[in-house]
């Protein structure tokens, strides 16, 4: 049996990050975690491009534009959607997750889902660097692993 695994090494990779400005007190921490994860694994800062969008709903379009440019080996999508009193939360979560998934499948470029979807602000804070780790950092490691896995498969 031949096992193919993505390694936590990189060789000249370039990563695009799309981050939502809405709930910026959370998303800026996710972005910090993503950049930290990439730099700690030897991705030079000049190989990391960051695009800010108004909110999570706008993430898939810019992720798709980045993917179509073919400049990036992976794209990391970061946002924070926190449930409120209306059904808006459900619509945004559904469309953002579908949109991000479609970008990855259509482009065949790893697109990491770092949009935290939580019931309350406390859960979002936990996922942005406290009790539950930092989902941005997790996405950075996942991006490096997926880049190497995709390269191995060809």
UniProtKB/Swiss-Prot annotation:
Active site, renumbered: 88 (proton donor)
Catalytic reaction annotation: (2S)-2-hydroxy-3-oxobutyl phosphate + 5-amino-6-(D-ribitylamino)uracil = 6,7-dimethyl-8-(1-D-ribityl)lumazine + phosphate + 2 H2O + H(+)
Alphabetically ordered keywords of this record: Riboflavin biosynthesis, Transferase
Binding residues annotated for 5-amino-6-(D-ribitylamino)uracil, in chain numbering: 22, 56-58, 80-82, 113
Record SUPFAM superfamilies: Lumazine synthase
Protein's recorded name: 6,7-dimethyl-8-ribityllumazine synthase
InterPro entries: LS, LS/RS, LS/RS_sf
Pathway assigned to this chain's UniProt record: Cofactor biosynthesis; riboflavin biosynthesis; riboflavin from 2-hydroxy-3-oxobutyl phosphate and 5-amino-6-(D-ribitylamino)uracil: step 1/2
Organism whose genome encodes this protein: Agathobacter rectalis (strain ATCC 33656 / DSM 3377 / JCM 17463 / KCTC 5835 / VPI 0990)
Gene Ontology terms, MF aspect: 6,7-dimethyl-8-ribityllumazine synthase activity
Function: Catalyzes the formation of 6,7-dimethyl-8-ribityllumazine by condensation of 5-amino-6-(D-ribitylamino)uracil with 3,4-dihydroxy-2-butanone 4-phosphate. This is the penultimate step in the biosynthesis of riboflavin.
Disulfide bonds: none
Keyword Transmembrane carried by entry: no
Binding residue positions for (2S)-2-hydroxy-3-oxobutyl phosphate: 85-86, 127
Family: Belongs to the DMRL synthase family.
Gene Ontology biological process terms, A to Z: riboflavin biosynthetic process
Taxon lineage: Bacteria, Bacillati, Bacillota, Clostridia, Lachnospirales
EC numbers for this chain: 2.5.1.78
GO cellular component: cytosol; riboflavin synthase complex
């Amino acid at each position: 049996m031949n096992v193919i695994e993505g390694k936590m090494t990189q060789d000249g990779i370039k990563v695009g990050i799309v981050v939502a400005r809405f709930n910026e007190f959370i998303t800026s921490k996710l972005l910090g975690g993503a950049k930290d994860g990439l730099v700690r694994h030897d991705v030079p800062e000049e190989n990391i491009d960051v695009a800010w969008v108004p909110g999570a709903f706008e993430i898939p379009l810019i992720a798709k534009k980045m993917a179509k440019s073919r400049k990036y080996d992976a794209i990391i999508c970061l946002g924070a959607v926190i449930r409120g009193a209306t059904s808006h939360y459900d619509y945004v979560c559904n469309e953002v997750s579908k949109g991000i998934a479609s970008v990855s499948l259509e482009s065949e470029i790893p697109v990491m889902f770092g949009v935290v979807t939580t019931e309350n602000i406390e859960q979002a804070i936990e996922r942005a660097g406290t009790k539950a780790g930092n989902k941005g950092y997790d996405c950075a490691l996942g991006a490096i692993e997926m880049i190497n896995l995709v390269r191995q498969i060809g």
